[in-house]
Amino acid sequence: MSSEDTEGARRPVQTEPGVLVHSGADRRLATEHWLLSTLTDRKRQAARREWERNGITALPMGTLMSAVRLPASLVVAATGGRFLSGEVDRMLGEIFEGGPVICDPGGHRYYALVPASVPRTWPDALDDWRAHEVECLGKGYHLCVPRLDITRHDEAYVSYWSVPMPSMATLCTPLRVARLIAAGVHALGAQAGADR
């Protein structure tokens, strides 16, 4: 008997009967299918090719999900981090409890993916947020969505998953997004007051 056998280093993981365990590759494939499900078959194939070739494809908003566009200045003020440092990404993951966020480094923006209903159910908040350059992209908008494995800032790609989408239909909770916006607005106001 080897020392590995006696120490249990290679023992199989025991699961409870009836528990189905999905591999990361299975979750990623299911998430890709979910993201592309708003497209026709022909457009779906073109989107897959764009992901492979360019690392990004445009997907329609307002059916499966919408996106709240957040200026980097507001996100950085709310989190206290530095843009593109990785710490903001980590903090967003905590704040949104793993809800997916896309970062557009060139545009200095983040996109929190939220339920498709947000533009209809939060109209007053959205009107208030526009003064702070926050916009909700619903029906009629398209969002450039990176390939699921692009999870770090890389000059080779236009955008990346600041907080990766862990599985299909997992989205940010609108209330958590609203709280981040409120914290960012407050922090920016405090900075402006201190600069006077």
Q: What label would you give each PLM region?
A:
Residues 121-124, 128-133:
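Active-site-proximal loop/helix of nucleotide/amide-processing enzymes and allied scaffolds
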Residues 130-148:
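Conserved short beta-strand edge segments in small beta-sheet-based binding/regulatory domains
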Residues 1-106, 116-119, 124, 138, ...:
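Signature for HUH/AEP ssDNA processing cores
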